[in-house]
């Protein structure tokens, strides 16, 4: 709710965009997929499977994006694109710590895979609306509508929450989450899709394990294995390949 309020406030600074009644069904679908279902499947998924499985399955997002782009006719990807996307998944597998593979469950794995599929549909399905509404308004509208689906689940939990016992660090984390992880994150994602296209944007999401690896090494002094360095190199090269590959976008 805080994130959607923040983004809606920023839309007042944006130039006016026309929103027709015919846009509402698609906005509702995008809100349900990209905000409600994605968050539910991702959060409950990582709670029920290993970090290793989560990283690998969520890295399937670019693969699903390429498939959806091809099926809908929005993007025609070259062979180099397919090579880069596939290699990126391999890179994520190499970066993962094999010791964290224990503790996974089929339910958790399916939930994470569902999250990847929801995010892919959210990315590819935004194309026609992005051109007219722009990334800021589309992010704000879908986030606001997505928040409505949380109400039946969120209000009972809030009523039971002992606010006086919540530490200030938790409040700080909440503010950071809705300002940066949600508001800024969703906006920049759609901004990138509007500039780069769905596939080229999606491939950058697989840089997350590389970033996490680098931060853990720099700030926590964690050891980085040869396997992980090789995986990071594969991800970087595959991202470059997709960035340089020929992807033909069509108006849908």
Regions from the PLM with identified roles:
Residues 1, 39, 54-60, 123-148, ...:
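Helix-helix packing/entry segments at the starts of transmembrane helices
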Residues 1-2, 43-61, 105-118, 169-179:
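Structural signature of hydrophobic alpha-helical transmembrane segments
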Residues 1-37, 64-68, 118-125, 139-159, ...:
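Transmembrane alpha-helices of multi-pass small-molecule transport proteins
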Residues 3-19, 40, 87-103, 145-171, ...:
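Membrane-interface helix-cap regions at the ends of transmembrane helices
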Residues 6, 28, 60, 68, ...:
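Hydrophobic transmembrane alpha-helices of multi-pass small-molecule transport proteins
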Residues 8-53, 57-58, 94, 178-196:
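Specific transmembrane alpha-helical segments of multi-pass solute transporters/efflux pumps
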Residues 22-30, 77-89, 108-109, 133-143:
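Cytoplasmic-side transmembrane-helix entry/capping segments in multi-pass membrane proteins
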Residues 101-128, 136, 149, 250-252:
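Glycine-/small-residue-enriched transmembrane alpha-helix faces in small-molecule transporters
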């Amino acid at each position: 709710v805080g994130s959607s309020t923040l983004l809606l406030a920023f839309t007042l600074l944006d130039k006016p965009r026309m929103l027709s009644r015919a846009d509402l069904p698609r906005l509702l679908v995008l809100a349900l997929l990209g905000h409600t279902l994605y968050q539910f499947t991702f959060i409950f998924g990582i709670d029920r499977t290993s970090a290793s499985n989560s990283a690998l399955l969520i890295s399937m997002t670019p693969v699903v994006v390429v498939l959806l782009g091809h099926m809908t006719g929005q993007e025609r990807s070259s062979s180099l694109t397919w090579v880069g996307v596939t290699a990126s998944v391999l890179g994520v597998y190499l970066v993962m710590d094999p010791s964290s593979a224990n503790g996974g469950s089929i339910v958790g794995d399916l939930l994470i895979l569902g999250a990847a599929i929801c995010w892919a549909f959210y990315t590819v399905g935004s194309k026609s609306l992005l051109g007219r509404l722009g990334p800021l308004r589309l992010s704000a509208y879908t986030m606001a509508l997505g928040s409505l689906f949380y109400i039946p689940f969120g209000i009972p939990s809030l009523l039971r929450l002992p606010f006086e016992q919540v530490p200030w660090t938790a409040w700080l984390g909440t503010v950071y989450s809705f300002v940066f992880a949600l508001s800024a994150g969703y906006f920049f994602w759609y901004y990138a899709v509007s500039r780069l296209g769905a596939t080229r944007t999606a491939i950058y999401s697989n840089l997350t394990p590389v970033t996490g690896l680098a931060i853990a090494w720099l700030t926590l002094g964690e050891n980085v294995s040869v396997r992980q360095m090789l995986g990071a190199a594969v991800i970087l090269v595959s991202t470059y390949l997709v960035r340089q590959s020929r992807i033909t976008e069509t108006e849908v």
